[in-house]
Amino acid sequence: MSGLFHHRTKPREIRAFVMATRLTKKQLAQAIQNTLPNPPRRKRRAKRRAAQVPKPTQAGVSMAPIAQGTMVKLRPPMLRSSMDVTILSHCELSTELAVTVTIVVTSELVMPFTVGTWLRGVAQNWSKYAWVAIRYTYLPSCPTTTSGAIHMGFQYDMADTLPVSVNQLSNLKGYVTGPVWEGQSGLCFVNNTKCPDTSRAITIALDTNEVSEKRYPFKTATDYATAVGVNANIGNILVPARLVTAMEGGSSKTAVNTGRLYASYTIRLIEPIAAALNL
């Protein structure tokens, strides 16, 4: 029966045939269906596939990453001269940091001999120096499950004693703190790239307006210790500031490595001299 009609059959022809032939309801419906244009085969297949593919489900839980890490790519040092002054810009690793249950306070003299290890070999060929800028940035290398916090601040009076608590350290100029697993957004300061957002960076910069001298003599850590052993106030004419760092709040009595502290700086090197004569 389905072959009696096709889609070009006119409705009045169907009515004439129905009048002459007694059809069942099913046969009549099939005959009418055969007169309708068939939908494209491609669309029919698409509908069947859509009906067979189950709808994806979405979970409503978002987990924070457990592992933390940053890709450090230090650029080569940049050296240039202006008049009688040599200007050097670079970034280098300052120190490795770890955390324990108890608070551990350390300090670093902000002078070429103690900032990293590379600068001292260069700066000893000049008699004096002056910081144009220097910034310390903490980058974590521990999981987000690591307990503890880092605290940093500057002391500009070298005759002052070191703080022994977070409360005392928090009063230092430029004080900054954060959990030991935080600070990735400070990577731009280390890699010397554009900083889109540093709101979560753990970083601190020396205020060069606070230093007591316009320029300082190049001295070793031993030279400094000898001088302040005679008079603590002498330190103010040898070193512009001291960086104080405290690590506390860990979950273990054994030190757990948390990250690294980098120093990025621009320094003016003044009056060249043979290193052997620079005493």
Swiss-Prot record:
<dbReference type="GO" id="GO:0005509">
    <property type="term" value="F:calcium ion binding"/>
</dbReference>
<keyword id="KW-1015">Disulfide bond</keyword>
<keyword id="KW-0946">Virion</keyword>
<feature type="region of interest" description="R domain, interaction with RNA">
    <location>
        <begin position="20"/>
        <end position="83"/>
    </location>
</feature>
<dbReference type="Pfam" id="PF00729">
    <property type="entry name" value="Viral_coat"/>
</dbReference>
<feature type="compositionally biased region" description="Basic residues">
    <location>
        <begin position="40"/>
        <end position="50"/>
    </location>
</feature>
<feature type="region of interest" description="P domain, projecting">
    <location>
        <begin position="270"/>
        <end position="279"/>
    </location>
</feature>
<protein>
    <recommendedName>
        <fullName>Capsid protein</fullName>
    </recommendedName>
</protein>
<feature type="propeptide">
    <location>
        <begin position="1"/>
        <end position="19"/>
    </location>
</feature>
<comment type="subunit">
    <text>The virus particle has a shell of 180 protein subunits arranged with T=3 icosahedral symmetry around a core of RNA. Each icosahedral unit contains three protein subunits.</text>
</comment>
<feature type="disulfide bond">
    <location>
        <begin position="188"/>
        <end position="195"/>
    </location>
</feature>
<keyword id="KW-0167">Capsid protein</keyword>
<feature type="region of interest" description="Disordered">
    <location>
        <begin position="31"/>
        <end position="59"/>
    </location>
</feature>
<dbReference type="InterPro" id="IPR000937">
    <property type="entry name" value="Capsid_prot_S-dom_vir"/>
</dbReference>
<dbReference type="GO" id="GO:0039660">
    <property type="term" value="F:structural constituent of virion"/>
</dbReference>
<keyword id="KW-1142">T=3 icosahedral capsid protein</keyword>
<dbReference type="GO" id="GO:0008289">
    <property type="term" value="F:lipid binding"/>
</dbReference>
<dbReference type="GO" id="GO:0039617">
    <property type="term" value="C:T=3 icosahedral viral capsid"/>
</dbReference>
<comment type="similarity">
    <text>Belongs to the icosahedral plant coat protein family.</text>
</comment>
<keyword id="KW-0007">Acetylation</keyword>
<feature type="modified residue" description="N-acetylalanine; by host">
    <location>
        <position position="20"/>
    </location>
</feature>
<dbReference type="GO" id="GO:0003723">
    <property type="term" value="F:RNA binding"/>
</dbReference>
<feature type="region of interest" description="S domain, virion shell">
    <location>
        <begin position="84"/>
        <end position="269"/>
    </location>
</feature>
<dbReference type="InterPro" id="IPR029053">
    <property type="entry name" value="Viral_coat"/>
</dbReference>
